From Swiss-Prot:
It comes from Chlorobaculum tepidum (strain ATCC 49652 / DSM 12025 / NBRC 103806 / TLS) (Chlorobium tepidum). It comes from the Bacteria. Residues 7-70 form the TGS domain. It catalyses: tRNA(Thr) + L-threonine + ATP = L-threonyl-tRNA(Thr) + AMP + diphosphate + H(+). One of its GO terms (cellular component) is cytoplasm. This is Threonine--tRNA ligase. Homodimer. It is found in: Cytoplasm. Belongs to the class-II aminoacyl-tRNA synthetase family. GO terms for biological process: threonyl-tRNA aminoacylation. Its cofactor is Zn(2+).
Length: 657
């Protein structure tokens, strides 16, 4: 049947395609899915009521917009994996009685749970936990939500569950929440806001991937816990596809390729999360910086440089300290020659320095917009367990720009920043880009700087610019920075993984905190609006993603070595040197391999080094004044005169394709 009605009051349900259906009041999400189709009902994990996710058994008592959530959607995966973290905790509790549980969220690829347990988990334990999870799944236990007063929940987790971590959350994080929700599956229960799967039977395939250590609540002064990572799927087929992607990802791992290709290094002698660029990697980074600097110059940006440290009072004024204090290096404290104590921070953000540059002179409305740009290095004390080569580092360089404009210029400037970001991604071969409008959470206004009215205007401007640029976007409530909404660009790499890279942020808060102003046409002072903008995001993260996207097979303009001259025999070495000299003079990064190895070995080694152009020279090429061109991963492309070849390579390099 397409609709469900009885003598109860009726409700009108609007589906995602705009169609409307009539149901009896109290109809559940599952019943709505069943009325649409059997396959949808089988795939249903949860549903949304007016955009808010709910358990499938939640009754709908008023007219509403409803959407069924399946595993195919990001929301569905998050719910599936969050429920799976509970399933894993349930399995651990049965296998290791006395284990207690901290935080267990869904993450981008799966889930984890932090566990306090005297037993030290190992790989053998992971396999046992997987088996127990599948056993519990086969029981097809109902997952039921229970709401209770916070005080009752404290008593429940203190006396029945005997879980001090949940009690601490209830007494601290949720101290102002009168009613909380607990999810039960047979004898296991967990504190959670939900929603969750309707039953454990939805989970058909399990893979636990890693064990690491963590601190309770991320605080190094608190107890150490064991973190187990995993991922689950509604079918074995999806798990097999995931494992195949993991294998491909291992081949593309930027840490592995970074070492093999001599791009960067990490060493404890320098410090965790502090990458050192080796010559080949420095070439790639320099090419990217040169590319963006040239494009920014065309678009009216002016460069600045700022120090690597700053007085702590600067960051207190901006709000970065103490807002980001948990992820900052400790202040550097010393006494000057007068005995006065001063504190400095390793620069966590470039923004405050740029605001001071803007404010150092009186500005007129005619001067705006002013676009300051800097490749500025910043430092964040990321948890050691979160570090990941270049893509998550403690020291990294942002392609940071701040645009100071009048309110009437704001939407145009946002559009220009979006256009620049698109240009960068298109040039670098990121064809699939998602856009998220990251807005504030109005129910948690104290988390943000500025008033609700200021936020309303900023979010209106961001949406207007995104609509004008024809961007298809999704909304991320609670994803905004503390000073303003932002547009986040999320690229999909060659094997389908998503990476957040560039960003455009609107800021009405910092101009107030730094008392920024310009003289308007009326002769009075006015506040500018600030746009924070970084197409790359950070050079380290962007290059790390680029390495994995290309598998180290860089386009010619970025390749550290663009061509290698490979003479077949010693008798053509002099001619090979002449060819090498011409390429070098033309600005093509070239190597000359004069070793007495066989040409096949030279070619294989050049392929492994991922050099785009291999120029093979034998007696025949010398006599004709030519070279034989072999392209990386493509093979032979024929013989060319030296000047013709150089022109061909220079055109490819300069066009950046």
């Amino acid at each position: 049947m397409s609709e469900i009605t009885d003598d109860r009051q009726q409700v009108i349900i609007t589906l995602p395609d705009g169609s409307e259906r009539t149901y009896s009041s109290g109809v559940t999400g599952l019943e709505i899915a069943e009325s649409i189709g059997k396959k949808l009902a089988e795939a249903a994990l949860a549903f949304t009521i007016d955009g808010k996710p709910r358990d499938l058994d939640t009754p709908v008592t008023e007219n509403a917009r409803v959407s069924i959530i399946t595993f195919d959607s990001p929301e569905g995966k998050e719910i599936f994996w969050h429920s799976s973290s509970h399933l894993m905790a349930h399995a651990i509790e049965e296998l290791f009685p006395g284990a207690k549980f901290g935080a267990g969220p869904a993450i981008e690829q799966g889930f984890y749970y932090d566990i306090a347990c005297e037993h030290r988990f190992n790989e053998e334990d992971l396999r046992a936990i997987e088996a127990k999870m599948l056993e519990i799944s086969k029981r097809n236990l109902s997952i039921n939500r229970e709401e209770m007063p916070r005080e009752q929940a404290i008593e429940y987790f203190s006396n029945e569950r005997k879980d001090p971590y949940k009690v601490e959350i209830l007494e601290d994080t949720l101290k102002d929440v009168p009613t909380v929700s607990v999810y039960h599956q047979d004898g296991f229960a967990d504190l959670c806001s939900g929603p969750h799967l309707p039953s454990t039977g939805k989970v058909k395939a399990v893979l636990l991937t890693n064990i690491s250590s963590s601190y309770w609540r991320g605080d190094s002064s608190r107890e150490t816990m064991q973190r187990i990572y995993g991922i689950t799927f509604p079918s074995d087929k999806l798990l097999k596809e995931h494992i195949a992607r993991l294998e491909e990802a291992r081949k593309r791992d930027h840490r592995k390729l970074g070492a093999e290709l001599g791009l960067f290094m990490l060493t404890p002698e320098v410090g965790s999360g502090l990458p050192i660029w080796l010559p080949n990697g420095a070439i790639i980074r320099n090419e990217l910086e040169t590319f963006l600097k040239a494009e920014q110059r065309k678009r009216g940006y002016v460069p600045v440089y700022t120090p690597h440290i700053g007085n702590i009072e600067l960051y207190k004024r901006s709000g970065h300290y103490p807002y980001y204090s948990d992820s900052q290096f400790p202040p550097l404290t010393y006494k000057d020659e007068t005995g006065r104590e001063e504190q400095y921070l390793l620069k966590p953000m470039n923004c405050p320095h740029h605001h001071l540059i803007y404010s150092q002179t009186l500005r007129s409305y005619r001067d705006l917009p002013i676009r300051l740009t800097e490749f500025g290095t910043v430092y964040r004390h990321e948890q050691s367990g979160e570090l990941n080569g270049l893509v998550r580092a403690r020291g990294f360089t942002q392609d940071d720009s701040h645009i100071y404009c009048r309110p009437d210029q704001l939407v145009d400037e946002i559009c220009n920043a979006i256009d620049l970001t698109r240009f960068v991604f298109n040039t670098l071969g990121f064809d699939e880009v998602e856009t998220r409008l990251s807005l504030h959470d109005p129910e948690n206004q104290s988390k943000y700087g500025g008033t609700a009215e200021v936020w309303g205007q900023a979010e209106k401007d961001v949406k207007e610019a995104a609509d004008r640029m024809g961007i298809k976007y999704f909304i991320g409530i609670g994803e905004a920075s503390f000073y303003g909404p932002k547009i986040d660009f999320i690229v999909r790499d060659a094997i389908g993984r998503k990476w957040q890279l560039g960003t455009v942020q609107v800021d009405y808060v910092m101009p107030e905190r730094f008392d920024l102003s310009y003289i308007g046409s009326d002769g009075q002072k006015h506040r500018p609006v600030v746009i924070h903008r970084a197409p790359f995001g950070s050079m380290e993260r962007f290059i790390g993603v680029l390495i994995e996207h290309t598998a180290g097979n860089f386009p010619l303009w970025l390749a550290p070595v663009q061509a290698v001259v490979l003479p077949i025999a010693e008798e053509v070495h002099d001619y090979a040197r002449e060819v090498y000299a011409k390429l070098h003079e033309a600005g093509i990064r070239t190597e000359l391999d004069l070793r007495s190895e066989k040409i096949g070995k030279k070619i294989r080694e050049a392929e492994l080094s991922k050099i785009p152009a291999m120029l093979v020279i034998g007696r025949n090429e010398q006599e004709k004044g030519e070279v034989s061109l072999r392209r990386h991963r493509k093979g032979d492309e024929g013989s060319f005169g030296v000047d013709e070849l150089i022109a061909r390579l220079c055109e490819e390099r300069d066009r950046r394709f």
